Amino acid sequence: MAKIMVAMSGGVDSSLTAVLLKEQGHDVTGVTMHLWEGDDNGIMESQCCSVEMTAGARRVCAQYDIPYYVFNYQKDFRKHVIDYFLREYSSGATPNPCLACNRDLKFRVLLERAELLGFDGLATGHFVQITGGGEQPYDLRRGIDINKDQSYVLYMLSQRELGRLHFPLGGFTKPQVRQMARERGLVTADKPESMDICFIPDNNYRRFLNEERPEIMQPGPIVNRHGTVLGQHKGLPQYTIGQRKGLGIAAGSPLFVIEIDTVRNLLIVGDADELERRDFVIDDVRSVYGQIEAGIYAVQIRAHGEAVPATITPREDGTLHIRYDQPQRSVTPGQAAVLYRDDRVFGGGRISTERYS
C-alpha cells in the first residue's frame, strides 16, 4: 500500500477521497492549503479556506484516525494566483484562477512538498480518471459524471505528475459521492459547493480589482468596429467577451462585447455574428504526452462547454493555431482551450489575446 497525501478543502469530495484511500489500506495524511486570509468582507462559509470548512476536514480526519495538517501557502498563492489574476485583467484577458492554482500550487508546489516529506503520491477530489501506466503512458480522462467532469482544469498535468497522482472519485457521480459520504457519517456529506473565486468572498471581483489595481479600472469609450462612440465603459476589467448585459447603451439590436482593447482603453461591441471566430491561437501550451501533434481534436473553450472539432497546427514559436470546423461564439482570451479525443485529454493552453489572421 502507498503513503498518500490528500489535499483537503473541507468539502465532501476531498473528505471522501481521504476516507476511500484509508479504507483501501493506504497510509493517508490529510493536508489543507491555507491560501488566503480574506479581508473586511470576511470569508463565506462555503469557501475552501474558511475556518468552518477547514474544521470539517479536521473532523473527518479525526473520525477515521487520519493525521491532518494545515500548510501555509499564502505567499505562493499571492504570487501564482492573485498576481496572475490581476495581470490577466490588465492585459484585457479573462483569467481562470482555478487553472493557475492547479498548475502552480496543487500539482507543483504541494506535490513537490509531498515528495520531500516521503509520500508516494498526492490525491485530490477532482472528478477525473487516470488510466494506463506500466509500459504504457498514463492517460488523463474525463470523469464519468459529465456534469462534474474537471479534466478541463487539469489539462496541464504531465506524465511525471500523473504517475504520482490519485483521483478516486473519477468513476463516480456526484450523487453517489454524497451518498457514500452519508453512509460513512461524514460531517461534510451535505456541504455546499465552494465558490469558483475563493479569494473574493462576496464574488464581487470588480470591487477586488478596484482595491488592488485601481489604475486599470479607468472609464473610456464604447465603440463599434467603425469607431463610432456609443457610450462609456466603467473600466475594461468589468467586461468579458460575449457580454451583453450591463453595457449601458441603447441600440436597435442587441450588442455584445467583441473585443477589449487595453492599449486604447476601448470596449468594442458588435452584433452576434461578430462574436463568431473560427481561428485563434493558444500560448503557454502544455501536453499530457510531451508534445501536441498536428491533427484534428475536439477543442473545449469553457469549463462546462462542448468540445467541438478543430484542426490544430503547431507554430514555430511554440503556440498552436486552432481552426474550428464551424465558427464558435465567445472565444475568450485568458481562458483555456483543451484538446480531447473521445474522453482523453491531450493538453491545451491559454487562449491568446493575439488576433489570428
Curated annotation (Swiss-Prot):
<feature type="site" description="Interaction with tRNA">
    <location>
        <position position="126"/>
    </location>
</feature>
<feature type="binding site">
    <location>
        <position position="125"/>
    </location>
    <ligand>
        <name>ATP</name>
    </ligand>
</feature>
<dbReference type="InterPro" id="IPR046885">
    <property type="entry name" value="MnmA-like_C"/>
</dbReference>
<feature type="binding site">
    <location>
        <position position="33"/>
    </location>
    <ligand>
        <name>ATP</name>
    </ligand>
</feature>
<dbReference type="GO" id="GO:0002143">
    <property type="term" value="P:tRNA wobble position uridine thiolation"/>
</dbReference>
<keyword id="KW-1015">Disulfide bond</keyword>
<keyword id="KW-0694">RNA-binding</keyword>
<feature type="active site" description="Nucleophile">
    <location>
        <position position="101"/>
    </location>
</feature>
<dbReference type="GO" id="GO:0000049">
    <property type="term" value="F:tRNA binding"/>
</dbReference>
<dbReference type="InterPro" id="IPR014729">
    <property type="entry name" value="Rossmann-like_a/b/a_fold"/>
</dbReference>
<feature type="region of interest" description="Interaction with tRNA">
    <location>
        <begin position="148"/>
        <end position="150"/>
    </location>
</feature>
<dbReference type="InterPro" id="IPR004506">
    <property type="entry name" value="MnmA-like"/>
</dbReference>
<keyword id="KW-0820">tRNA-binding</keyword>
<comment type="similarity">
    <text>Belongs to the MnmA/TRMU family.</text>
</comment>
<dbReference type="Pfam" id="PF03054">
    <property type="entry name" value="tRNA_Me_trans"/>
</dbReference>
<dbReference type="GO" id="GO:0005737">
    <property type="term" value="C:cytoplasm"/>
</dbReference>
<keyword id="KW-0547">Nucleotide-binding</keyword>
<keyword id="KW-0067">ATP-binding</keyword>
<comment type="function">
    <text>Catalyzes the 2-thiolation of uridine at the wobble position (U34) of tRNA, leading to the formation of s(2)U34.</text>
</comment>
<feature type="binding site">
    <location>
        <begin position="7"/>
        <end position="14"/>
    </location>
    <ligand>
        <name>ATP</name>
    </ligand>
</feature>
<dbReference type="GO" id="GO:0103016">
    <property type="term" value="F:tRNA-uridine 2-sulfurtransferase activity"/>
</dbReference>
<dbReference type="InterPro" id="IPR023382">
    <property type="entry name" value="MnmA-like_central_sf"/>
</dbReference>
<feature type="disulfide bond" description="Alternate">
    <location>
        <begin position="101"/>
        <end position="198"/>
    </location>
</feature>
<feature type="site" description="Interaction with tRNA">
    <location>
        <position position="335"/>
    </location>
</feature>
<keyword id="KW-0819">tRNA processing</keyword>
<dbReference type="InterPro" id="IPR046884">
    <property type="entry name" value="MnmA-like_central"/>
</dbReference>
<dbReference type="Pfam" id="PF20258">
    <property type="entry name" value="tRNA_Me_trans_C"/>
</dbReference>
<protein>
    <recommendedName>
        <fullName>tRNA-specific 2-thiouridylase MnmA</fullName>
        <ecNumber>2.8.1.13</ecNumber>
    </recommendedName>
</protein>
<keyword id="KW-0963">Cytoplasm</keyword>
<feature type="active site" description="Cysteine persulfide intermediate">
    <location>
        <position position="198"/>
    </location>
</feature>
<dbReference type="Pfam" id="PF20259">
    <property type="entry name" value="tRNA_Me_trans_M"/>
</dbReference>
<keyword id="KW-0808">Transferase</keyword>
<dbReference type="GO" id="GO:0005524">
    <property type="term" value="F:ATP binding"/>
</dbReference>
